[in-house]
Structures are given as structure tokens and as C-alpha cells.
């Protein structure tokens, strides 16, 4: 191998090393961008999970409130029906108090009236 061939080989190796160095720099930059994107995606994922949890809690609370409201309405309608029946009996002239329940009433009874006013 003469000096010219040796010199050409060294120049060729230098060009290859330069090319590899540029490729390594590009790869390093690409990895940095991927790491940054991964970090942003992790933060976004964390925020979305928090929003999902908050929304799920709100939905569960809303459903529980609706169920409680239905239960209360059912109880109120039951209470209202019984109250109406007792008020009707009192208007028809019967006692509805625990002292004289069912007996014929002569005038107003304070016990019956206090029961009707409890509502």
C-alpha cells in the first residue's frame, strides 16, 4: 500500500466517522424530543385520570342523590296518604289521637289537633 492509498483510506475513514457523528447527533436529538414528548404525555395522562376520577365521583354522587330523592319522595307520598286518611277521619268526627282513637268526637280535641299540626 503506498502513501496515496493510505492517505485516501484515512480520508475515507474520516468521512465515515463524520457521518457517524452526524447520525449520532441526530439520534441524540430525536431521543431528547421523544423524552420530552413522553414527559408531556405522562402529565396529560395524569390530568386526564384526575378529571376522570372527579367526573366519576360526581356521577356517583349525582346517582346517590337521585336515589335518595326518589326514596324521600316515596316516603313523603306514603306519609301524605296516611296523614290525609287521618285528617279525613278527624273531619268525619272521630278521634285520631292515641288517647281516644276511633271514638266519636264531640268538639275539637287538643291531642288530635296537635297530631295534625305536627306534619
Swiss-Prot record:
One GO term (biological process): DNA replication
Record: residues binding Zn(2+): 95, 97, 109, 112
Cofactor note: Binds 1 zinc ion per subunit.
Record localization: Cytoplasm, Nucleoid
Keywords (A to Z) from UniProt: Cytoplasm, DNA replication, DNA replication inhibitor, Metal-binding, Zinc
Superkingdom, taxonomy of origin: Bacteria
A Pfam entry, by short name: YabA
NCBIfam families per record: PRK13169.1-5
Function summary: Involved in control of chromosome replication initiation. Inhibits the cooperative binding of DnaA to the oriC region, thus negatively regulating initiation of chromosome replication. Inhibits the ability of DnaA-ATP to form a helix on DNA; does not disassemble preformed DnaA-DNA helices. Decreases the residence time of DnaA on the chromosome at its binding sites (oriC, replication forks and promoter-binding sites). Tethers DnaA to the replication machinery via the DNA polymerase beta sliding clamp subunit (dnaN).
Subunit record text: Homotetramer. Interacts with both DnaA and DnaN, acting as a bridge between these two proteins.
Family to which the UniProt record says this protein belongs: Belongs to the YabA family.
Protein name: Replication initiation control protein YabA
Source organism of this protein record: Bacillus velezensis (strain DSM 23117 / BGSC 10A6 / LMG 26770 / FZB42) (Bacillus amyloliquefaciens subsp. plantarum)
